[in-house]
Amino acid sequence: QKVFEWSWQIRPSQPLSAGLWNPVLTDLNVLQLENSDIITYHNYNGPEEHQTVIDSLRKYNRPLVCTEYMARRNNSLFTNIMPILKKENVGAINWGLVAGKSNTKYAWDEPIPDGSEPPLWFHEIFHPDGKPYKQEEVDLIKSLTLSK
């Protein structure tokens, strides 16, 4: 609460936001929602659950930005989440772009001690040489971001 109070006193030019990341932390979530200029949130669930979260956040009548999404093993995919975000006018940021920088092709809780290729990349879009992990994902991202 104090951080928001201090921030409101100096009123920075950028919007204030504290990202929602754990639905179990209800008191913290209420504080964040009531004090954020824009609502930022994480969601690594499939399309039905993600839509439910968007619907529940709409009641605050503030812009929404999903600051973390896309976890292939969780059925949170570019192909089923990005169209929802586009339709709902929700900003989107996903972890990982090129394999190797942040190593998020590996799931956080499934280490591969020898560093071998995971059977399914968790995040990441491109191999280090620039080749897409899945061309259809890159095509979808381009089509959704270039269309109005």
Task: State what each model feature region is.
Residues 119-148:
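A short C-terminal boundary segment appended to hydrolase-like catalytic domains
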Residues 1-100, 104-130:
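Extracellular glycoside hydrolase catalytic/binding regions
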